[in-house]
Amino acid sequence: MRAARIETCGLPPVVADRPAPVPGPGETLVEVRAAPITPLDLLCATGSSYFGTPTLPYVPGVQGVGTADGRPVWFPTPAGMAAGDGSMAGLASVRAEDLVELPPEADPYAVAALGLSAVAAHMALTWRGELALGEQVLVLGAGGVVGQAAVQLARLAGVRRVVAGARSPAGQERAKRAGADAVVALDTDDVTDLAIRFSAACDGPVDLVLDPSSAPRQRPRPAPCARAAAWSTWAARRPRPARSTPPRCAAARSGCSVTPTTS
């Protein structure tokens, strides 16, 4: 089979023929259809990640989409983080318990591009953030895949307003295309200036903040959130009146489709 192979950390992979993997106990052979190149793949390939130097050579690819026994599946791998090969090959041997079966109509390329990023956005909004109908949401880092997914998922959930923050002009444009009602340029470190921008973009207090940027928790909060929501990486919300059954967002109770954009 053809596979990408990291032979030297810090250098591009080499594409070459390689023997097909032999599944071990509890593993399943997956015919790979799509494999994204994620930031984690790039980090592991440098040899300087927090997982340590990977055993060389190895096939990169920490996640992918393919078919197993005729079923469309999404799958993760430990490539670059532990011994073993990844998804950037014609075939991959994956633990059967790690396979996530997909609907037959799912676009394998869209699912591969979204992957864990869309799951992270969905979980942050719904499980951690308890997003409810009619709320106002602020998404930082909205030009990245997690941020774009969060903007679209929030829209599908029936929020009243989505405000996005992105640093680069390209990221701001991606956030707009994802459906943000307003986009704040994060191109300055002037806290007062940023507070003015957020205040102008937000329609009153923000109910939920999603921050996938892994920034320090002590960073200044946008002014509309200062009185209401404690700051937290990933998701934080302002207190709301107690109610017996909070209205569940549409994205939490039904299937939804989000679209990755990188250009």
Put a short name on every predicted segment.
Residues P19-I37, S48-A82, G86:
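Glycine-rich beta-strand-centered segment in the early N-terminal region that forms part
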Residues V159, P216-S263:
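Glycine-rich phosphate-binding loop and adjacent beta-alpha segment
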